[in-house]
Design a protein with these regions (language model features):
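Lipid-exposed faces of alpha-helical membrane segments in multi-pass integral membrane proteins
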Residues: 1-5, 22-30, 105-116, 138, ...
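Alpha-helical transmembrane bundle and helix-membrane interface signal
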Residues: 1-37, 123-129, 186-203
């Protein structure tokens, strides 16, 4: 998804874009059929209750956590599912625990903050002075946005598990370091844009 989005933003003509997109769509089912564990993940996604103690266990426990949270949650540190019921509760399925402790309202507030961050990233990309900064800011924003959406879809059982963490929230070493570094780069581009605008205003005032 990220590669296709970056190619599109890079200005590739639509017919060439389709030449890449169509084989990629055809390759997805082939890649799923090649590995048995991918088929198991797909079957668990389609019907988790068919194997409630095996492949479907994680998704079922995730849905239990979200359902237990209700509208306003059970309260901070009052989650039950994180105590060895939900696997990877601190990483891939941290959103389920957030939903259990803070409820649907808490998840909505979290996603509102995510939308604000994505908006800031898009604005930074749009205000970039050069094409490289535009692509870099767009790439960082897309990585964050795509990972956030995919993680939410996995936790809610909308798509099969992918193993992607929730950026800036999930625990982890490499993923967290890379995400923080990416946000630092995005902030650097935003700051340079602000400095360029300030310099431009100063030059205009001097000319007047």
């Amino acid at each position: 998804l990220l590669m296709l989005a970056m190619i599109f933003l890079g200005g590739m003509k639509f017919r060439y874009f389709l030449i890449i997109l169509v084989p990629a769509l055809v390759a997805v089912p082939v890649l799923i059929l090649m590995e048995p564990y991918r088929l198991l993940r797909l079957s668990a996604f389609l019907d988790p209750w068919a194997s409630p103690k095996d492949e479907g266990y994680q998704l079922i426990q995730s849905l239990y956590a979200l359902g237990n949270g209700g509208w306003f949650g059970t309260g901070l540190f009052r989650s039950r599912q994180k105590y060895r019921f939900l696997p990877f509760a601190e990483s891939d399925f941290i959103l389920s625990i957030i939903g259990e402790e803070f409820g649907f309202v808490g998840i909505c507030i979290l996603f509102l903050l995510c939308v604000v961050l994505i908006y800031k990233g898009i604005r930074t990309a749009a205000e970039s002075d050069d094409f490289f900064s535009f692509l870099l800011a767009s790439g960082v924003t897309l990585v964050y946005g795509i990972q956030t959406v995919i993680n939410a879809l996995v936790v809610s059982g909308t798509i099969p598990p992918t193993g992607l963490p929730l950026p800036l929230i999930s625990s982890g070493n490499t993923s967290l370091v890379i995400t923080m570094a990416s946000m630092g780069i995005l902030y650097g581009i935003s700051r340079r844009n602000a400095m360029s605008r300030a310099e431009g205003k100063t030059v205009n005032k001097r000319r007047r």
